[in-house]
């Protein structure tokens, strides 16, 4: 990390403050998962969310500057495997949609109708996101507002990832 001029701060709860909720900016899907996270069928239940990572980088003047990266993974609830992901320097629809497209291709072998579950972030309320799911006959599911337990599989993954990183 030092060779790349990165310096990471210690992990704190305060550093996990990214919130993608911007009110109702699109369609709110019903909560089809209802905390039934277990499945015996691979690629049937997929969960996603966006998280923010902060890191320090030394600029050309030798000063440390805070930078951010945004991760948009799609995780299979069958075995906890990350099927696809997008990384960007700003929260972007392009990152979410490209990761969504990869996840749809990977899960196309599922013999049953798939469900993609997320929180109510702006990216998952977009018409483009919803219409791609509809075109591929995939159910869209969203957590209740302000309820992290409805997407606890993804939140737990982020918690472990950040503890390992920082």
Residue ranges and their predicted role:
Residues 1-41, 147:
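Basic, flexible linker segments flanking DNA-binding modules
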């Amino acid at each position: 990390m030092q060779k790349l001029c990165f310096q990471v701060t210690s992990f704190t709860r305060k550093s996990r403050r990214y919130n993608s909720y911007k009110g109702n900016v699109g369609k709110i899907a019903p909560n089809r998962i209802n905390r039934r996270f277990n499945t015996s069928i691979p690629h049937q239940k997929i969960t996603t969310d966006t998280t923010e990572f902060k890191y320090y980088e030394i600029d050309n003047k030798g000063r440390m500057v805070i930078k951010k990266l945004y991760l948009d993974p799609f995780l299979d609830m069958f075995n906890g495997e990350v099927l696809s992901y997008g990384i960007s320097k700003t929260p972007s629809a392009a990152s979410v949609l490209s990761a969504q497209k990869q996840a749809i291709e990977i899960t196309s072998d599922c013999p049953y109708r798939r469900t993609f579950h997320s929180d109510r972030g702006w990216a998952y309320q977009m018409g483009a996101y919803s219409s791609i799911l509809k075109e591929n006959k995939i159910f869209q599911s969203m957590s209740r507002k302000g309820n992290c337990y409805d997407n606890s599989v993804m939140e737990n993954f982020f918690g472990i990832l950040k503890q390992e990183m920082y």
